[in-house]
Amino acid sequence: MTNSNRIKLTWISFLSYALTGALVIVTGMVMGNIADYFNLPVSSMSNTFTFLNAGILISIFLNAWLMEIVPLKTQLRFGFLLMVLAVAGLMFSHSLALFSAAMFILGVVSGITMSIGTFLVTQMYEGRQRGSRLLFTDSFFSMAGMIFPMIAAFLLARSIEWYWVYACIGLVYVAIFILTFGCEFPALGKHAPKTDAPVEKEKWGIGVLFLSVAALCYILGQLGFISWVPEYAKGLGMSLNDAGTLVSNFWMSYMVGMWAFSFILRFFDLQRILTVLAGLAAILMYVFNTGTPAHMAWSILALGFFSSAIYTTIITLGSQQTKVPSPKLVNFVLTCGTIGTMLTFVVTGPIVEHSGPQAALLTANGLYAVVFVMCFLLGFVSRHRQHNTLTSH
């Protein structure tokens, strides 16, 4: 593989995460405007965004098989066509059914693109370098999560219609589409070059189960926590502005942490540092949940920084449980994480209704403790060390 080709594929991976981050995180910014547009209460409008999450979940799950049937370049180019149709649907329709369908299509496109992006990184890089590259790729999710809400605020403040926010997000896919030209993608399944040696099917092992549970609990815990921090902070007498600043600080610190750990991870065994970070994150979340408002800003900054590397390290270790990175395995771990996203309000909504926001934060804390236990148990069964030894010879 030529260096320029590798750079193009790496940028496609970066932008695939930016696309998903922009679509998921911008929701809160535009929801009120969309509710006004359709003359609906915000609470019923939020349910239609489930179509976005459902599209992401279904496409990540199915793409484990689709990757071996439909070439990656074809998928990305077809995704561009779907993206144009979805944004056009948002712009020119006044029907809630069409809006929901467009959201589902956006979810499908972003899920397919993100699973391809993840697979490209696991395919192009080996060992510890894979972990740091995947972490840097994931930082584009957070970066888009910071940039696009600012773009949305800028447009909405000037009374520009909300659908132009999605048109701006579509520009990320335009860049991906342009990068596919003159770029060679790894061939999979029936398109892969034929070899005389029989393909040995590897068993995944129990380590994948531990990592999948950790991925689900981590994302469910993280989103369950950050979704209810503003309500919890307001209950302690903080202003809405200060409560919002806590969330912004978390994501800013999370992004800085990703950049820092993309360098730091190269010097450590991934399973050991993952266990340490998961334990630290659980402790820091407990400090935030039981601390005074005066210490909240510092504890959430520390939590964002030290938890930033957990999810991508889980995915990296998943890809290292087999000698050859398996798209099915990587997508399985990703799917478990996405199920965590889908369950966020299903799990935390009733808890908040019955026991208040702090109960939701403590539940999230319990989920982080489960992540720590899974990472600790992984140490006894993980195959990443033997596979790293093989690739280094």
From Swiss-Prot:
Induction: By selenite or tellurite. Maximal expression was detected at concentrations of 10.0 and 0.5 micrograms/ml for sodium selenite and sodium tellurite, respectively.
Membrane topology reported for the UniProt record: Multi-pass membrane protein
UniProt cross-references to Pfam families, sorted A to Z: MFS_1 (PF07690)
Periplasmic topological intervals: 32-50, 99-100, 155-161, 227-244, 294-296, 353-360
Primary location group: membrane
GO terms of biological process kind: response to selenite ion
Cytoplasmic topology ranges: 1-10, 72-77, 122-133, 183-205, 266-272, 318-331, 382-393
GO cellular component, one term: plasma membrane
Keyword hit for Metal-binding: no
Source species, domain of life: Bacteria
InterPro entries in the record: MFS, MFS_dom, MFS_trans_sf, MFS_TsgA, MFS_TsgA-like
Subcellular localization: Cell inner membrane
Keywords, in A-Z order: Cell inner membrane, Cell membrane, Membrane, Transmembrane, Transmembrane helix
Family according to the record: Belongs to the major facilitator superfamily. TsgA family.
NCBIfam families assigned: PRK03699.1
Record protein name field: Protein TsgA
Gene this protein is translated from: tsgA
